Amino acid sequence: MKIDETTYYSVLGLPTTANKKDIHKSYLRLARKLHPDKSKSNDFEELFKVVVQAHSILTDISSKQEYDAILKRKGLSNYTPLGYKEHTKKQNQSNNLNQQDASKNSKKNDGVPTQSKVTRKNKPYEQQPYGFGLDFNEGSKMKKDKQKGRNTSKNSKEQQGSQETTNTSENLQRNAKGNKNNKNPRKDRFHTLDNSLDTENDNKRRNIKKAKDRTSKDQNTYSHTNYQRKRNKVKFTQGSIRMRNPEATQSNPDLQNDWDPLKDIISQFGNSNIQDDFGIENIKPSSDPRTFELEDLSLDCEYDFVESNSRVRRANMQNVFINEMDRLMINDPLDMSSIKHSLYSIPYTKRQKTSQSTYTFNDQNYRFTERLPRQENSEGPFGEIPSVFESSTGTMENHRSDFNLRGRPETRENDNIIIPEMMHFPDAVTSKEEEVSLKTRFNHFNEDCNRTKEYILKVLKNRISVDKDLSDMMTVPEYHSLILATKSFDVHLSKQLLELNELQFNAGQRYTELFKSIQY
């Protein structure tokens, strides 16, 4: 047995596009052939080790990705083994043959109904024949059973007349058979009894139907309606159904006794002398609710509030006209002291007081103070005024001094950032000593520039952290000028960083040109 060991995929007999399921299937197929328990040859044992290694690498996701990258570099990403190509060709040929056979069979069977083409007709169960609605199947030949046991409610009226004729014809046929074959008289006697019973039942049904028809004709007569009224007299007297010509109902004394207490309650509502629990008199309504006098529209204005037993009583109402309103209105100004006293008298729970916390960051060249947002205290019943509405006098000066420690963009006197000067380069390098000195000076220049760049980046990082901590404070209108100053300082720092990068680029370019022109 030979195995293509070009790639791990070809060891398993698969292309590089195989998925995990195909890898596992091919591994099991080869393991059944090459496992040491199945074959004792040493060659198969070595091949099985190669198959196990290929399976372990291709089933692991990380190792499979690394191996695929190696195959791409080697140009083997689209490699397919020879055995896989032959297998696919055979499979395609077999599929084509199966398709051709299926097409031939379909041509031969044209016009012959198959089971897949047959559909059942949608009918109710009672109307469904014994053949289950199939066109090519014949129904049962027991027409007698169909007529007796399969009669539907829709066709019952139409088939009643036909049943009578069929019963009589069946009786004649059975009697004729009985005369010919007298071997079993019990059987003949049994048939005659059954037929007589059927005819009797049919006659009874016909008589019942005729009686019903006779009553339906007499329903419109006066005697019939009078009978129905007397029959349902109890229902009409109870009031559930109204009659066309009802009789006069007699009064019931029990019902009158039930209405007496309700009449007393209604009569008490009309009495104007009754007062409620709050001392308010009830006004007697007028006879006609739609008519009223102009004097009744006057204002009830005299309000005398008296505190007694935690209730408010209103004095007797009097009619007050509009010209008397000035005399009765209250001219005293509103006193807020009573409202304040009532508010402070409300019980409340005090919260624990918290102090303002600060955090300082110290450095040799940089310092700032982070002021955390102030937590609210509750000295009074409603706490202190929120910090957003307080006047921030003095705090702006403190924060401005914190920003001044970093250096102001207007003047460069307070800046601690010192940009190194451009190093001097000779016109040409003529000796070994000049070359060594040029290298040392260039290294020192790069170290100074990098040190300054580190400091600038550190300042920018701290500036970002301060902006995050003081973002709420910067939205206050008093700090708008401070926002502009800090942002201009950020621009100044970025310009210095750009200047340093340009110096280093120019120095490096000049340094490489000198070393290219060395001639000694």
UniProtKB/Swiss-Prot annotation:
Q: What protein name does the entry list? A: J protein JJJ2
This protein's gene is called JJJ2
Where is there biased composition of kind Polar residues? 152-182
- What Pfam families does this protein's entry cite? DnaJ (PF00226)
Provide the residue span(s) of the region labelled Disordered.
82-257, 389-409
Task: Please name the SUPFAM superfamilies in this protein's record.
Answer: Chaperone J-domain (SSF46565)
Q: Name one GO cellular component term.
A: nucleus
| InterPro entries recorded | Apopto_cytoskel_mod, DnaJ_domain, DnaJ_domain_CS, J_dom_sf
Q: Where is the J domain?
A: 7-71
Q: Spans of biased composition, class Basic and acidic residues? A: 397-409
Q: Where is the composition biased (Low complexity)?
A: 91-100
Broad class of the protein's primary localization: cytoplasm
Tell me where in or outside the cell this protein is found.
Cytoplasm; Nucleus
State the Gene3D superfamilies in the record. DnaJ domain
Signal peptide residues are none
Keywords assigned = Chaperone, Cytoplasm, Nucleus
Q: Which residues form a coiled coil?
A: none
